[in-house]
Amino acid sequence: MMELQVIRIFRLVVAFVLCLCIFIRSASSATKGFESIACCADSNYTDPKTTLTYTTDHIWFSDKRSCRQIPEILFSHRSNKNVRKFEIYEGKRCYNLPTVKDQVYLIRGIFPFDSLNSSFYVSIGVTELGELRSSRLEDLEIEGVFRATKDYIDFCLLKEDVNPFISQIELRPLPEEYLHGFGTSVLKLISRNNLGDTNDDIRFPDDQNDRIWKRKETSTPTSALPLSFNVSNVDLKDSVTPPLQVLQTALTHPERLEFVHDGLETDDYEYSVFLHFLELNGTVRAGQRVFDIYLNNEIKKEKFDVLAGGSKNSYTALNISANGSLNITLVKASGSEFGPLLNAYEILQARSWIEETNQKDLEVIQKMREELLLHNQENEALESWSGDPCMIFPWKGITCDDSTGSSIITKLDLSSNNLKGAIPSIVTKMTNLQILNLSHNQFDMLFPSFPPSSLLISLDLSYNDLSGWLPESIISLPHLKSLYFGCNPSMSDEDTTKLNSSLINTDYGRCKAKKPKFGQVFVIGAITSGSLLITLAVGILFFCRYRHKSITLEGFGKTYPMATNIIFSLPSKDDFFIKSVSVKPFTLEYIEQATEQYKTLIGEGGFGSVYRGTLDDGQEVAVKVRSSTSTQGTREFDNELNLLSAIQHENLVPLLGYCNEYDQQILVYPFMSNGSLLDRLYGEASKRKILDWPTRLSIALGAARGLAYLHTFPGRSVIHRDVKSSNILLDQSMCAKVADFGFSKYAPQEGDSYVSLEVRGTAGYLDPEYYKTQQLSEKSDVFSFGVVLLEIVSGREPLNIKRPRIEWSLVEWAKPYIRASKVDEIVDPGIKGGYHAEALWRVVEVALQCLEPYSTYRPCMVDIVRELEDALIIENNASEYMKSIDSLGGSNRYSIVMDKRALPSTTSTAESTITTQTLSHPQPR
């Protein structure tokens, strides 16, 4: 008897174990291919709602300093309480996720609310999926459907106005049917709706594909009727069909159902619409519920009957081209007994798949990065290498060219990156590489050889710790024109007779100047800088004591008063400051009262969040509160105050006051009622009223005068470092005021020991020479201002990856038209016919000069001011002349755009170094 009980218990245990194994296997099978990432999570965890396991993202990004906790008000429905915020000045950060080639996937990113009007872009591979713009206190989601082309996919965040951030990433396999007819496209989810339900969103485990079905109310003119039924014994054969939990509710109407989706992108896109049906009324038979389906009033399905195929459920996939809006309309067919019914629907926008970098180049550069990181952990340049090396933002030090539809790497510049170890031999497999610069590092082992088929034309190995002989395979490369390998202490330079006779530039392995040790540089630099600063300070004291208390800035025709009380201080070894005592200190309590406890957020800048406030005298102000993530201390803040308070000019936003209490660093400026130039050119304000050409020209001149004042600041030039249209503010009189000096620095002078400034700026405006060399000068501002001038002329953003690829960069798109004298092609359509051709040409040619790749060829801001003054005089004189013609009954001049060559010459207000009549090869300045 006892043995029988033991046998029964054993059988029960075995049955339980088998059931458990089957359940685990079933659950594992259901989530095969799922990737669930919780950014900045301390460890892996299981979400109690979905039972899915989320993995921390530390294997991609280990730096915990970029982690933030989501405010409690926002994370009630999220399993992950953290967010990763990438503090980058430009470029992208990507998550590399495993895929199976040719499998269709859904990828979803979840972004908690960060700040109002913050925006950045998201891409799948190098195909831009969309812009994320935060306008309400709620989470943002973006979802795309794609076919994997290899064994991984990059999910990338691209910086726009603010540092990008993310909380969760979810990758899920999907049925093939989703990409039917869109094989080479990425589908961006616009809407996925569960109709008639009033409960929470439905997702995994109810939906085995983990699609998230959100409840939606109808927008039909007359009330739609929710319909629900406890559905059972329904065979859902189609893999794209929603789960029964979604299909058991629906909306119906006796005559018509309509669902309106406004606010779509205004460019023409193809859309895929999935409509899902399940007949919930058991009394309805085939032929009794028949209706027509329209998309944007275009009939797509006539006399559609859910039950026609013999099944209770059905779905249909429809395609349509739309611009700005998409309406789904279901209309009862003639003779039908019942009105239309719809249980759920999905709308997806098709985006063309963009080819990534040449696969071989991609594999080589990724392997090279891995090898370099073995000896160079936490190297800033290598850590910034993320995603595709060429697209959308190229990696630092990499230059690419187009070749047969994909990008190839032609230049690799890793100079001055403090790299150690052996030079990765895999670099020799980059078959398209033409220029390789590895100078000024600490490499100690040379690669073995380059193949004879190499296209290399320039190689720089100088200033490293290489030893031995230069391989003959390098010396004899057929296309090599430049070779530098000097200043490697242990490398032989004796046998140079084998050098390729075709070499044009070489150092023959010799070191022209011995590289001084760091200690020597530091001591000599410190002594030189200290002596120079003391001399400058004493000189300025005597100069200001005897000089009349005002200065006149040449080219501006105006005298600007000096502060009556000034203080001289030497806060650092390489800067001196003139501090005005007119800036008012505010208490933190007063600031909180003026802003009503920081009630109205009006923007985000390089300094931090900006709030609107009102002082006791009624003056409206903009209050900038330094970001909590800033590492700036009290001393640095005081130095910045010294700079800001000393600058007084009608085209610069004045500093009214400051607060430095309880670790809070706050700056107070007057509020600019007309917003920024960006907003007036292509922001929300531009939709209300187009900025006319004379006003644009006046704004350009005002901004140029402000920058010229900074560059000619008494004693030492000040460089803005972040010139862009959003930093040019407009007061009530539309007078331009250059703003945001949080990044400003004094310019280097002769005698400075070295220049070591962190590269700052905004993508689309950044001077390529500054980015490459990290050597800052006034000409860096000039380049950025040239971009602003093109914005003013064209009304376009400096960088917009939503446009066709050839138009992503405003500068690269506009240059060919300007050089071909086809300026009309780039002019903002809103001002066409409303400008004088000669005035416009002056501005365009100044812009082109500003955008010279080499700073030597760019004009200074004072020259730019003179040219813009001339342009404004031409424009104003033409306007007055045409007004007199109009008063006599003549036609408006704006009906004709005059050809510039037919115009009489004008008298310049001052001799300028800018050539305005030709586009000949530039000369150094």
From Swiss-Prot:
The active site is at D722. Expressed constitutively in the entire root system, except in root meristems. InterPro entries: Kinase-like_dom_sf, Leu-rich_rpt, LRR_dom_sf, LRR_N_plant-typ, Malectin-like_Carb-bd_dom, Prot_kinase_dom, Protein_kinase_ATP_BS, Ser-Thr/Tyr_kinase_cat_dom. The chain crosses the membrane at residues 522-542. GO terms for cellular component: membrane. It catalyses: L-seryl-[protein] + ATP = O-phospho-L-seryl-[protein] + ADP + H(+); L-threonyl-[protein] + ATP = O-phospho-L-threonyl-[protein] + ADP + H(+). Pfam families: LRR_1, LRRNT_2, Malectin_like, PK_Tyr_Ser-Thr. It is an enzyme of class 2 (transferase). Belongs to the protein kinase superfamily. Ser/Thr protein kinase family. This is Nodulation receptor kinase. It comes from Medicago truncatula (Barrel medic).
